[in-house]
């Protein structure tokens, strides 16, 4: 199984880029993991919120492949503790044959078409985070889940 984090828009602040890349590299010791970046839309000032979600949704759908298991990181998704997320990842590793794709949408969330193709939604918190920060938090949680599953010393309960 390959695990992909699909995100809309690039990370611009160097300290986030460095930390995200560090956790991606650490995670690759355990699983095949990468982050794909969908370029952000240009000239969005002329678009309504719904129009921007639709255009970003089209780009997200284009990046998906047949057989992908699609999990949206969404404020209305299921919340999990780190141990629960590790168990979730273990179940996915045992059942997903192709790609497990976690998706972080644009600033206004997902289009209805993206919601329709999604298999699941999970929430990182009831709080709101910047799109840059949630990428870092999520890749850290993927790494944490892998260390839990492999008996590493990283996580303390």
From Swiss-Prot:
Primary site of residence: cytoplasm
E.C. number: 2.1.1.177
Record: residues binding S-adenosyl-L-methionine: 73, 105, 124-129
InterPro entries given in the database record: Alpha/beta_knot_MTases, RlmH-like, tRNA_m1G_MTases_N
Pfam families: SPOUT_MTase
Domain of life: Bacteria
GO cellular component assignments: cytoplasm
Alphabetically ordered keywords of this record: Cytoplasm, Methyltransferase, rRNA processing, S-adenosyl-L-methionine, Transferase
A GO molecular-function annotation: rRNA (pseudouridine-N3-)-methyltransferase activity
Reactions mediated catalytically: pseudouridine(1915) in 23S rRNA + S-adenosyl-L-methionine = N(3)-methylpseudouridine(1915) in 23S rRNA + S-adenosyl-L-homocysteine + H(+)
Cellular location(s): Cytoplasm
The protein's role, per its UniProt record: Specifically methylates the pseudouridine at position 1915 (m3Psi1915) in 23S rRNA.
Family to which this protein belongs: Belongs to the RNA methyltransferase RlmH family.
Subunit description: Homodimer.
Name of the molecule in the record: Ribosomal RNA large subunit methyltransferase H
Species for this entry: Bacteroides thetaiotaomicron (strain ATCC 29148 / DSM 2079 / JCM 5827 / CCUG 10774 / NCTC 10582 / VPI-5482 / E50)
Organism taxonomic ancestry: Bacteria, Pseudomonadati, Bacteroidota, Bacteroidia, Bacteroidales
């Amino acid at each position: 199984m390959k695990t992909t984090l699909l995100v809309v828009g690039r990370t611009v602040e160097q300290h986030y880029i460095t930390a995200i890349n560090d956790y991606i590299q650490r995670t690759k010791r355990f699983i095949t993991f990468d982050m794909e970046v969908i370029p952000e839309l240009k000239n969005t000032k002329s678009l309504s919120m719904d129009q921007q979600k639709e255009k970003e949704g089209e780009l997200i759908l284009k990046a998906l492949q047949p057989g992908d298991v699609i999990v949206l990181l969404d404020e209305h998704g299921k919340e999990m503790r780190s141990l629960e997320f590790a168990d979730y990842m273990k179940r996915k590793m045992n059942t997903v044959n192709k790609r497990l794709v976690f998706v972080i949408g644009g600033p206004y969330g997902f289009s209805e078409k993206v919601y329709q193709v999604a298999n699941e939604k999970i929430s990182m918190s009831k709080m709101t985070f910047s799109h840059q920060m949630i990428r870092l938090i999520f890749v850290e949680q993927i790494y944490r889940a892998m260390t839990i599953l492999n008996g590493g010393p990283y996580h303390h309960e």
